[in-house]
Amino acid sequence: MAIVKCKPTSPGRRFVVKVVNQELHKGAPHAPLLEKKSKSGGRNNNGRITTRHVGGGHKQHYRLVDFRRNDKDGIPATVERIEYDPNRTAHIALLCYADGERRYIIAPKGVSAGDQLIAGALAPIKAGNSLQLRNIPVGSTIHGIELKPGKGAQIARSAGASAQLIAREGVYVTLRLRSGEMRKVLAECRATLGEVSNSEHSLRSLGKAGAKRWRGVRPTVRGVAMNPVDHPHGGGEGRTSGGRHPVSPWGFPTKGAKTRGNKRTDNMIVRRRK
């Protein structure tokens, strides 16, 4: 993995910083694990914008990633290759199981082509192996963590993400997340050892607005630059600060206001995030 800073041969190249990984597969992805991915442009079935700043971008295929790994317990798998996935910040690994089936998983850091991985209670403590939390030693770094047994990984899936298993008590284990939050999760839930690959993703710089458009992201217009009919911060003579605490276009507090509303699981959070 190398960080490449481009020479300023043009305004669009001046600020480009790329992350180059020579281990990534340079050919086509595994066709049976691809699905059509249609674009909505941020519109719902009525044609109205429900998600702002979405539209355009390069056509993509969705890679079917196995977030469960619970039906391959005890079957060893060989990592065939590490691939780029346009749908996520992490890289993905193509596994070939001993029974001949191939599946994609989120590529753990340090795992490369030719490595042997396995899932199940008897799996050794090694990066890339998937176990129930009750079988993982306290202090281990993990990713791809389930919140409900059998539902599939939901926590720590993006590039460089991980959590630490810090305690085990009864049917629950306690995790420390990267945000600083400490929460309890059922010990039956699964997780993968190690941290997610491509941790240098945060060091890249796209360099120009067009590179963002290639990824399907449209411009963000500030509320203070709009008219009063379009945003609560709009209008005024000359440049203004908005005249009130920051709010969304619909008047809800933003920029730091707490939005968590799921009180049902509050008792699972030991310490709130920082």
UniProtKB/Swiss-Prot annotation:
Residues 28-55, 224-274 are annotated as: Disordered. It holds the Pfam family Ribosomal_L2_C. PROSITE patterns: RIBOSOMAL_L2. One of its GO terms (biological process) is cytoplasmic translation. One of its GO terms (cellular component) is large ribosomal subunit. It comes from the Bacteria. SUPFAM superfamilies: Nucleic acid-binding proteins (SSF50249), Translation proteins SH3-like domain (SSF50104). InterPro entries: NA-bd_OB-fold (IPR012340), Rib_uL2_dom2 (IPR014722), Ribosomal_uL2 (IPR002171), Ribosomal_uL2_bac/org-type (IPR005880), Ribosomal_uL2_C (IPR022669), Ribosomal_uL2_CS (IPR022671), Ribosomal_uL2_dom3 (IPR014726), Ribosomal_uL2_RNA-bd_dom (IPR022666). GO terms for molecular function: rRNA binding; structural constituent of ribosome; transferase activity. Keywords: Ribonucleoprotein, Ribosomal protein, RNA-binding, rRNA-binding. Part of the 50S ribosomal subunit. Forms a bridge to the 30S subunit in the 70S ribosome. One of the primary rRNA binding proteins. Required for association of the 30S and 50S subunits to form the 70S ribosome, for tRNA binding and peptide bond formation. It has been suggested to have peptidyltransferase activity; this is somewhat controversial. Makes several contacts with the 16S rRNA in the 70S ribosome. Belongs to the universal ribosomal protein uL2 family. This is Large ribosomal subunit protein uL2. It comes from Pseudomonas putida (strain W619). The gene is rplB.
